[in-house]
C-alpha cells in the first residue's frame, strides 16, 4: 500500500494559491486514477483505490499547512504504512515555477508543512516531490506570495509541473524512488 500526500490549506480562499500546489497534484492523481476524495477522517480528506494492482491512498490534510503531520501520522498508523511507502508533494520557493525536485530525505528547508510532518513522523527520511513556485519579486512578503494565486503567465508551467508530479507518482508505484529521482531531476 502506498500513501501520497499533497500539502496545502483547506478552504475556498486558498484554492489555486501557490501554497496549495500539493493539493492540486493530488486532485490530478484522483482524476487520473478515478479515486474519489470523499473520506473525512484523520483531520484530512482522502480516498483509496487500486492502480496497476497497487493499493493507493491519496490524502489532503485539512489541518492547515503548519499542522500537516497531525493528519499524516494517524493515517499512516491506522493503515500501517511504512515511511518508505509514503511520498509528500509540496510547494518550494527555491525551485522555479514549472520545475520539480525529488528527494529521498532531508530537512524541512523552512517549509512548515514539512517541518510538522518530520516532527510527527520522528524522521526526515521520507520521499518528497518539491514543486517549484519561485521566490517573490519586488520585495513582496513571502507569506503574501505563497498565499497568492499564480499569474496567468505562470499557469502553463504550473499545469506542466502538476502533470510531471503525477507522472512521477505513477512511476513510483512500479519503480524505486531513487530511479524516478534520476529521471525527473534531470
Swiss-Prot record:
Highest taxon above the source species: Bacteria
Signal peptide: none
EC number from the UniProt entry: 3.1.1.29
Catalytic activity: an N-acyl-L-alpha-aminoacyl-tRNA + H2O = an N-acyl-L-amino acid + a tRNA + H(+)
Location in the cell: Cytoplasm
EC supergroup of this enzyme: hydrolase
Active site: 19 (proton acceptor)
Keyword Lipoprotein tagged: no
GO BP terms in the entry: protein quality control for misfolded or incompletely synthesized proteins; rescue of stalled ribosome
Family: Belongs to the PTH family.
Protein known as: Peptidyl-tRNA hydrolase
Source organism per UniProt: Bacillus cereus (strain ATCC 14579 / DSM 31 / CCUG 7414 / JCM 2152 / NBRC 15305 / NCIMB 9373 / NCTC 2599 / NRRL B-3711)
Amino acid at each position: 500500500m502506498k500513501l501520497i500526500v499533497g500539502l496545502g490549506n483547506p478552504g475556498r480562499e486558498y484554492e489555486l494559491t501557490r501554497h496549495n500546489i500539493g493539493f492540486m497534484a493530488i486532485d490530478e492523481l484522483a482524476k487520473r486514477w478515478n479515486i474519489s476524495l470523499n473520506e473525512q477522517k484523520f483531520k484530512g480528506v482522502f480516498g483509496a483505490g487500486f492502480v496497476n494492482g497497487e493499493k493507493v491512498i491519496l490524502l489532503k490534510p485539512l489541518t492547515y499547512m503548519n499542522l500537516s503531520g497531525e493528519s499524516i501520522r494517524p493515517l499512516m498508523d491506522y493503515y500501517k504504512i511504512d515511511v518508505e511507502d509514503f511520498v509528500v508533494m509540496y510547494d518550494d520557493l527555491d525551485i522555479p515555477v514549472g520545475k520539480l525536485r525529488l528527494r529521498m530525505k532531508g530537512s524541512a528547508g523552512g517549509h512548515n508543512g514539512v517541518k510538522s510532518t518530520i516532527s510527527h513522523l520522528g524522521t526526515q527520511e521520507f520521499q518528497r516531490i518539491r514543486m517549484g513556485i519561485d521566490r517573490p519579486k519586488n520585495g513582496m512578503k513571502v507569506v503574501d506570495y505563497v498565499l497568492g494565486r499564480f499569474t496567468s503567465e505562470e499557469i502553463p508551467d504550473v499545469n506542466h509541473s502538476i502533470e510531471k508530479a503525477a507522472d512521477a507518482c505513477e512511476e513510483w508505484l512500479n519503480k524505486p524512488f531513487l530511479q524516478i529521482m534520476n529521471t525527473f531531476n534531470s
